[in-house]
Amino acid sequence: MDYEFKMKTQQERAKVEDLFEYEGCKVGRGTYGHVYKAHRKESNDTKDYALKQIEGTGLSMSACREIALLRELKHPNVINLIRVFLSHTDRKVWLLFDYAEHDLWHIIKFHRAAKATKKPVMVPKGMVKSLLYQILDGIHYLHSNWVLHRDLKPANILVMGEGNERGRVKIADMGFARLFNAPLKPLADLDPVVVTFWYRAPELLLGARHYTKAIDIWAIGCIFAELLTSEPIFHCRQEDIKTSNPYHHDQLDRIFNVMGFPQDKDWEDIRKMPEHHTLTKDFKRSNYANCSLVKYMERHKIKPDSKAFHLLQKLLLMDPNKRITSEQAMQDPYFSEDPMPTADVFAGCPIPYPKREFLTDEDQDDKGESKRQQQQQQQQQANQQAQQNQQQQANHQNQQQNQQQQANQQNQQSQQQQQQQQMQQQQQAQAGGMDHSAAKRVRMSGPNGQPGNGMNQQDYQVQQAQQAAAAAAAAQQQQQQQQQQQMMFNNQQQGGFQQRY
């Protein structure tokens, strides 16, 4: 490409900073980048817009996927991508959307805080129904076009504020969305872990490779329950961590504590899940015998015979093949009873929720410092755990060494006892031989203990010296612990021998 033509094209290309005013109007941040509330410069257009700056330089795969899908998808309940800005100077990417003043995360947070007061304010029933219907309508459109959202959660469900689309639901953040009509490989191979843990379907947690649009339905069921109770139904303390292993023990435990352990008859394919062996090893069915969705919702004052509960049950079926579809859910009797769902989820009433606050760099620094402190605490806990593990290993090794020493001592004592028994047997045999020789000499001796006719005085003295030497040699063979006993025994033997003579 001609250099001059390239430079001319860049100069003519619109720049986001020339068209929009957004400085000091940051309303959101995340791993994706930053979001600003913006309005046009030098224009009669008073409409507010959302400018999403993609983190990093250039286009990431997630950004490319989101741009490609949103340029094709057009539905009242799916966020509208108006324009894409590419800055060739700093290689920044900007996405321009319609601005939504509210989202379900802030709305539910507002009502959860109200529950702590003496006069709790729940999300109005009509508003819950309208929110759910519009979410289902938007997801039905995505599924009809072979798109899985894969990251549905309250923060990604936007609600428009005052304006032409007041109270309209907008499904946002398509960074994890995928086409599923004919993937080149199993979806689990592309992204092993998707969806925030609290809204993750059980088949994902058990390592399903060929998962379907039922994972979005499970997430909608979680959002529905949260709207009814103002509490995350499958709240788990574990943070959302990207990992290649989809199995998550604590999240499964939380699901079973609410739903109960799945029966084989209720989920026939559970044995085919890649992590089924780990599941049976880590969990006992009997621990969740008294758990059920009925009991959980009754604690939150949701009657099990209500149409809302019946629909919730269909959305939160463990078996993805039995889980209701978005189209079937929209035709559920829940939506045909009063109050009927409305296009404006606020039903024309004043909006009680505060507008988004602008974030400052100090907020960012505070959050960064808080994050660093949290990381330091986690590191300290990890170090303490490692030290405890090392101490346990050292204690175990010391215990093994002590046991080995005790075993060696027992073996030595056993060997000493055997040697003592053998020596005693030898001594008894020698004593018997000495008694026999003494008796023979008595028969051969004359009066007053003198040698008899068969032995002269010299032979007698030689024989006596030999016997004394033999007794001394036997005494030396005994161990130190038995020396005194052996010497007493020899003295007794010698004393008896002298008495005979």
UniProtKB/Swiss-Prot annotation:
Residues 373-431, 446-501 have a biased composition (Low complexity). One of its GO terms (molecular function) is protein serine kinase activity. The keyword Zinc does not apply. PROSITE patterns: PROTEIN_KINASE_ATP (PS00107), PROTEIN_KINASE_DOM (PS50011), PROTEIN_KINASE_ST (PS00108). ATP binds at V27, G28, R29, G30, T31, Y32, G33, H34, V35, K52. It is found in: Nucleus. Keywords: Activator, ATP-binding, Kinase, Nucleotide-binding, Nucleus, Repressor, Serine/threonine-protein kinase, Transcription, Transcription regulation, Transferase. One of its GO terms (cellular component) is nucleus. Gene3D superfamilies: Phosphorylase Kinase, domain 1 (3.30.200.20), Transferase(Phosphotransferase) domain 1 (1.10.510.10). Its EC number is 2.7.11.22, 2.7.11.23. One of its GO terms (biological process) is protein phosphorylation. It comes from the Eukaryota. It catalyses: L-seryl-[protein] + ATP = O-phospho-L-seryl-[protein] + ADP + H(+); L-threonyl-[protein] + ATP = O-phospho-L-threonyl-[protein] + ADP + H(+); [DNA-directed RNA polymerase] + ATP = phospho-[DNA-directed RNA polymerase] + ADP + H(+). Residues 21-335 form the Protein kinase domain. The active site is at D151. Pfam families: Pkinase. The keyword Transferase applies. Belongs to the protein kinase superfamily. CMGC Ser/Thr protein kinase family. CDC2/CDKX subfamily. Component of the Cdk8 module of the Mediator complex. This is Cyclin-dependent kinase 8. It comes from Aedes aegypti.
